[in-house]
Amino acid sequence: MIKGLYSAVSAMVMNAVRQQTLSHNIANLQTPGFKQILETSGGFMQGQAVYTTGNLNGSPIEYVGSMGLGSKIGQEYIDFVQGAMQKTDNPLDFALQGGGFFTVQTPDGNRYTRDGRFLRDSENTLVTVDGFQVLDDAGQPIELPDGEAAVSAEGVISVNGEEVATLGIGVFADPMTELQHTEGNLFTGPDASTGEEVPRVAQGYLEMSNANPSQLMTQLVEVARSYEAAQKLVQNQDELLGKTISSLGRIG
């Protein structure tokens, strides 16, 4: 009986966490460069189930398998699959085709991002929509003279036909293990690239979220139903436990 209560409560907790993650992914469906969060699930409090024909002190015990008391969220990880490309025709919108991340400077140090919504600030420095400076391949802020900016597929930025900088693009052999999410669309990781892929830069495009809206909504409905079922099971177990305690009281 108590085991059933453990299982139901753990299912409620797990589904509450899953609902929070799914809601976060849904809230960022329109965020350029967003990488959805995925989760694994596993059991907890695993034990051995035994079978005996009589007294535990004298009868042989046969192990029949393992028994868990519920489920829990196992591991949370970032899905780095590339999102769809959306054309904007904004000359300072950049998207990366393939692997790689733009390098930006924040108050907490350098960070990596796939969000290519860039702007000129009041000092003609290339910055993100959050005001972080975009860095070149030497780790320096990119200064843009007045004029029309263009970027090549290799990331070379030109203004009025003259080269001014090359985008600092970090490439990683295994971003899932090498990068850690910090906040928003930012990641921290090694100072130098570890991968050999050469991404292509597309000007006038943005990479959109890699989350699938219809899939997320389906999962959200499934989680809500699972939570409701577990909640009803907790209520049933609670009622049954109450009746059992009441019966034992009458026997005494």
Language model features by range: what are they?
Residues M1-G252:
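Amphipathic alpha-helical polymerization modules
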